[in-house]
């Protein structure tokens, strides 16, 4: 399955593909299943994402610790073995894990964030040892919880990447959230103005690239001028829409973006993962995006 996903991306022109997280039943809980302290048997009911949805969540009932062998290195090596391009590996960030699990033990958000970051760091370092050159931590919760992000979340992110050499590109993804099906225009997304509130801390933090959405939210492009040091991965495909973008509209937006940031610090990508899209539509969107990038 990972090979099929990688082949689709490479065929479309993607230079740094991912494994599509096809081994994971949930992109957050997959990590948590490899940790001590989590209870997946007795779930807790919670309302999430500012009321966007409610569900039953695994509970934290003890100190969060790594348990056993790293999963990330195994998954990365299996994917890299069937890819002609360097594979980027993605992991959920500590603040996002906190929002998608039920804390019944810590009652101390900064402490829980730090302990989760330590477990992520162990996976990150295992990826480094396995030869992975592109490692991404996903923190969509930053856009919804700006105060937490600034108070302790950014420190947690840096903790995730502690000990990573400069030869490895350290990436953080911050989108504004998506529904569980296509073309849901009533879904309550995070306010994209959060990017402006976070920009200074992001730019000063100890990682290399920040991935933001733009197609779904159409940012004020002055935002890009606030990133003086970071490379920006610029979301250019609507991943929760069945509409196929045109090459021309993506080219136009990228040209506008380049009025605000240096060319060598702008990377083109989808807003987020493509899991909501049918396979052929996902490939068509990627192909259009790659064609647009090649024209700039």
Over which residues does each language-model region extend?
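Domain-level signal for soluble alpha/beta catalytic cores
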Residues: 1-296
